[in-house]
Amino acid sequence: MENLEVMVILFIIVILGYVACKLGYMGDKFDKKLSSMVVDITCPLLVLSSVMGDELPDRTLILPLLGVGFLTYILLLVFGFWVPRLITRNHDDQGMIGFALMFANVGFIGYPIVSSIFGPKAIFYAALLNMPNTFFIFTAGVMLIKGEYSVKQFNPKVLFSPALLGAFVAALLVAFGVHTPDIIARPVTMGGNITVPAALMIIGSSMAKLPVKEIIGSPKVYLSSFLRLVVVPLSIYFLFKVCGVSDQVNDINTVVIAMPVASFGTMFCLKYGRNPSLITEMTFITTVGSIITIPLITLLFS
């Protein structure tokens, strides 16, 4: 019941963004600037804040967690580039669907859900599992959104993107057992906390610009959403279960992967001048659907 309540609360913020756009408080120009601020400023702060608690995770788990995280995203990379070709022949749509299948809304929705299910300490493990997400979303994710699948399109500057640098610093803090002074941790945490409502309201605002028939979705949207919410997380869960990954790590990783489509999809579309309609539809449908699927998936852990 608690997990369902958290999902409903987050969805209400999406609706708030929808209403704000309809009332004229949000729109294309504002959303684009807010998206850039979330991507480049508040999200890196959110990543850093996840390792600025009183207790740090067991250092011996850092490499295993990173290993599981990277292996997960390598599998998702293959899945994200191959499966969309079976769903549609439209090149641009393939990229959008691939992004949706690969990247879950971990930083914005995943951390609160992980905390509510496994306790506040588990957010540190989720942050480590999510580090590969930060790398791949700013490399493969950008390629998918832009529709440029060649490795030649890779920009080395992405390795120095604020979000990835934030993840590197977070890993160093954990590895060396650094406890951040409260005078630094508190403003970082406050800045990072802007990410969740801002990102969700951007989704709602983008949704407000869609015709009703697009909000309702199309067969490919529902198929992609089902793959995102059910097939992908269950496949990852049972695969690592068979491979002998510890229940604690596997359970947290599964919840991380079971989140709805990452808000970065919509924000990347706005940032790179792509049509956000399809990715926003999938984000909306998966956000609504996850209210049911995430609590059901957690039944595997009981």
Question: Model-flagged regions — what are they?
Answer:
Residues 1-302:
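Alpha-helical transmembrane segments of multi-pass small-molecule/ion transporters
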